Regions:
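Transmembrane alpha-helices and adjacent helix-loop boundaries
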Residues: 2-283
Length: 283
């Protein structure tokens, strides 16, 4: 009897249940220790303080890039998802082609192709149209294709839009067809049925993958460093590369970069889980 009690997964002490060591989330403990060590070096080492100060300004640019890119990706994903479930052959074919091509190409290649092939071509085309129509305001709009930040946003949003298209499609198809039929029987059009009945329910279903993709985009925003940026406005990874190359402090630089990304990812994970619990579909 005594041996059975000792093998239980919890121990009783002072009338309270305490987890045994094997039930403690040790990965959190290890991360906390590593984070505290790096924070200690940052607060006590002049070299770490200089590195961290230089990199910290890249956090804002990284968050801006992620948020703006994700908002565009949500739009592209919704359009692609609706196209994927469309019964119109042309629309369905175009949406499927977009999804399959983008998902079949590495995101880094997508970013480079958009930044150095599509964006310059689009900028030149808009300028020619503006000249032909004598419309200077159109030429001013071409800055979207010339600005490094906007090219990064377009690359991330188009790349992640393909993945979000499948998320939207799966979420919409998870809703019972009876919901659509009931809405149509009440006199709603197909678009109204999607907008007021199907999509509100689908969004609650797809919240977890949407949140995961947002965090994934935060980390993949580091790929934008491959297309270059204005130094004072560089995102975190590019600032790390610049600082490491000029000071030769690779150890301090990449420890700080990793810590900053980890802090942002864990912080967003907490927010995403809170939103999921608040808006999740009851089981």
């Amino acid at each position: 009897m005594t041996s059975q009690v000792e093998r239980q997964s919890t121990a009783i002490k002072g009338g309270r249940l305490l987890p045994l060591p094997r039930n403690i989330p040790w990965w959190i403990v290890i991360l906390a220790i590593c984070g505290l060590l790096i924070l200690y070096f940052i607060t006590t080492s002049t070299s770490y303080q200089e590195t961290f100060t230089f990199l910290a300004s890249g956090v804002i640019r990284t968050l801006q890039l992620t948020v703006v890119g994700y908002l565009f990706a949500l739009v592209f994903g919704l359009i692609g998802g609706l196209g994927r479930i469309s019964k119109n052959t042309v629309i369905n074919t175009v949406a499927t082609l977009y999804v399959e091509v983008i998902r079949g190409v590495p995101l880094l290649v997508v970013l480079i192709y958009i930044a150095f092939v599509l964006a310059p071509a689009a900028s030149s085309l808009v300028s020619q149209i503006a000249t032909a129509l004598n419309a200077p305001f159109l030429d001013n709009m071409a800055f979207v294709f010339r600005d490094d930040f906007m090219r990064g946003v377009l690359g991330l949003s188009i790349g992640y839009g393909a993945y979000l298209s499948e998320v939207y499609r799966a979420g919409i198809e998870s809703i019972s067809r009876g919901q659509m039929e009931a809405a149509r029987s009440l006199g709603m059009s197909y678009g109204q049925s999607l907008r007021y009945v199907v999509l509100p329910q689908a969004v609650r279903v797809i919240l977890p993958p949407l949140g995961n993709d947002f965090i994934a985009m935060l980390k993949d925003s580091s790929l934008v460093s491959a297309i270059g940026a204005v130094p004072l406005e560089a995102e975190l990874t590019l600032r790390g590369r610049m600082y490491s190359a000029t000071t030769y402090k690779a150890f301090e630089t990449w420890n700080s970069v990793a810590l900053l990304y980890l802090m942002m990812s864990l912080g967003l994970s907490v927010i995403v889980r809170y939103v999921e619990r608040r808006w999740s579909v009851p089981k």
